[in-house]
A protein has these predicted regions:
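Cytosolic regulatory regions built on CNB/CRP/Popeye-like sensor folds
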Residues: 1-365
Length: 365
């Protein structure tokens, strides 16, 4: 993924990073980011190789079961190797996030470390920089999640549903004007029970927001290559699929074209009569290209949801769990991943109000 940053960042973005950041040499074997501990900087790997791994689960039965199922070991499982051009820091521009993986130098490496405080300030003040970095982050995180699934096995797809309710985050982050544009640019359509909205392995042509009803996500059990699966429908055959999640109102599907991800490996189907708002891929792509403030908000949403998806897999398998359970003693100095802050509760109210406003706007049009 070394070309992502060069492709997505501008010359002024790179100049600012070089001026603000500090080059650091990392000895082979040294831990750069430790799972569950705060990150103070964004790291760009300039030279060398980094290893991304999961710490050993604390006797979690689900983690043991999946490790056995996929034929792997539980201790310090390798999930990715990063080369020059990759970026790590687990979205350091979100101060409530703790790393879900450990990153250490596999060989002697050189990184550019950009302090979190300066980065957060830059993201607020420079919309163009924010749009570029959030998009690059989303692309890299999408690739990282794909690597995790490939390393741990496709059985982990069932665990990859974000812990953040998408409706709560998406509609809290977007502006009223953004939502108004989505309504105007999109088309509301009814998806009858049993209708496939997105076929796994096939190109995605629109971003879909579920307004009413329920959709299922199903993974194909066909082990043929993606091209063979994509054209199998021409032969009139259907490959067996296994449902692993259900979507409800406010959830989105179809974001893969905007982060240069391959066509999704799962299919999306209506399990009851449903209504969706569909924004054509070409219209949204044009909007993202010409409206930088909107692009910054949109790609930030995708980056956070992808990071949360990665955390969902790791946490569900029991790797470095930092969530609070009933009857557990609370450590006031510890941050728990399922702890509800006052800011989060305020976001919930705001997101709900905006989603209801969007529904009313659609009904009037």
């Amino acid at each position: 993924m070394r070309e992502v940053l060069l492709k997505e960042l501008s010359n002024s973005d790179i100049d600012w990073m070089l001026t603000t950041g500090t080059k650091e040499e990392i000895a082979a074997g040294k831990v750069l980011i430790r799972q569950g501990e705060p990150v103070t900087a964004l790291y760009i790997l300039l030279d060398g190789e980094l290893l991304v791994s999961l710490s050993q689960p604390d006797n979690n039965p689900l983690g043991r079961a999946f490790a056995a199922l996929e034929g792997g070991e539980m201790s310090g499982r390798e999930i990715a190797r990063l080369s020059s051009g990759d970026m790590v820091g687990e979205i350091p521009f979100l101060d409530t996030y703790l790393p879900s993986t450990t990153v250490k130098a596999l060989t002697k490496s050189v990184v550019l470390a950009i302090p979190q405080q300066q980065l957060a300030k830059k993201l607020k003040e420079d919309i163009s920089f924010a749009a570029h970095l959030y998009r690059a982050s989303a692309i890299l995180l999408s690739d990282r999640v794909e690597q995790i699934v490939n390393q741990l096995g496709h059985s982990t797809l069932v665990l990859s549903q974000p812990k953040l309710r998408e409706i709560l985050f998406i509609f809290a982050e977007l502006r009223d004007s953004d939502i108004d544009w989505l309504v105007v640019a999109g088309t509301v359509s009814k998806i009858s029970t049993g209708t496939v909205l997105i076929q796994g392995g096939r190109p995605v042509e629109a971003l879909h927001i579920l307004l009413e009803g329920k959709l299922t996500l199903s993974a194909s059990e066909d082990d043929r290559n993606p091209l063979a699966r994509a054209f199998s429908s021409l032969e009139g055959g259907e490959s067996p699929e296994r449902e692993f999640a259900r979507l409800s109102r406010g959830d989105i599907v179809g974001e893969s074209p905007f982060i240069e991800a391959p066509p999704p490996s799962f299919s999306v189907k209506a399990v009851e009569d449903s209504w969706v708002l569909s924004i054509p891929q070409w219209r949204l792509a044009a909007k993202l290209l010409h409206d930088l403030p909107f692009a910054a908000r949109f790609y930030r949403v995708l980056a956070v949801l992808l990071a949360d998806k990665q955390r969902a897999i790791v946490s569900s398998l029991g790797y470095g769990r930092l969530s609070y359970s009933k009857d557990q003693s609370l450590d006031e100095s510890q941050q728990y991943e399922n702890e509800l802050s006052s800011d989060f509760l305020a976001q919930v109210a705001l997101a709900g109000a905006r989603f209801d406003w969007m529904l009313k706007r659609i009904r009037r049009s």
